[in-house]
Amino acid sequence: MLVMTEYLLSAGICMAIVSILLIGMAISNVSKGQYAKRFFFFATSCLVLTLVVVSSLSSSANASQTDNGVNRSGSEDPTVYSATSTKKLHKEPATLIKAIDGDTVKLMYKGQPMTFRLLLVDTPETKHPKKGVEKYGPEASAFTKKMVENAKKIEVEFDKGQRTDKYGRGLAYIYADGKMVNEALVRQGLAKVAYVYKPNNTHEQHLRKSEAQAKKEKLNIWSEDNADSGQ
């Protein structure tokens, strides 16, 4: 439809040029009599009609160019189209200072030492003042320590909500050479999915799938003789 409109527009412009030439001829011959005057009137009428058609086609072409809220250059018409953007998570580099326990590590982040609490997971305690050392706590601590100490690259990934807890610890997903430590702990049955608070739950479903698999395989905290403590 747009191509046809442009074609007709070009034809209209050509007609206008021809009409102008005819008017010029009529003016040069207007002194030759009544016939010349009629010819002049005819040429003028053709020009006016052509200009009306060209104007109409031009408006139609402009309307076609902005159809669906996007003009032909690809820019959006804000009065017609509005897109809702979703904040994406991104990983940031950090370096290891030390692993504290199964779900807590201390990293150098943006030039400052910072303690991080792994999001959405909870491992058995090893240093709790009241609970003491819980079953599978040492195993979880050793697992996390091995992952982060052997990694050549450590990254942190904050979620969409609150970045720190009431103790000032960073709340994040921790990656060791591209592997999420949070998920690895859950998959090995060394952590449960816990402390889920929106909107800091982007990876919740992924973690729950890993937890379900660990339960199915009765790994560590989900083993038969320890299943109740993990519920």
UniProtKB/Swiss-Prot annotation:
It comes from the Bacteria. Residues 61-73 have a biased composition (Polar residues). Ca(2+) binds at D103, D122, T123. One of its GO terms (molecular function) is metal ion binding. One of its GO terms (cellular component) is extracellular region. Residues 27-63, 64-82 form a propeptide. Transmembrane segments: none annotated. SMART domains: SNc (SM00318). Binds 1 Ca(2+) ion per subunit. Residues 203-219 have a biased composition (Basic and acidic residues). Keywords: Calcium, Endonuclease, Hydrolase, Membrane, Metal-binding, Nuclease, Secreted, Signal, Zymogen. Its EC number is 3.1.31.1. Residues 1-26 form the signal peptide. Residues 61-86, 203-231 are annotated as: Disordered. Belongs to the thermonuclease family. Enzyme that catalyzes the hydrolysis of both DNA and RNA at the 5' position of the phosphodiester bond. This is Thermonuclease. It comes from Staphylococcus aureus. The lineage of its organism: Bacteria, Bacillati, Bacillota, Bacilli, Bacillales.
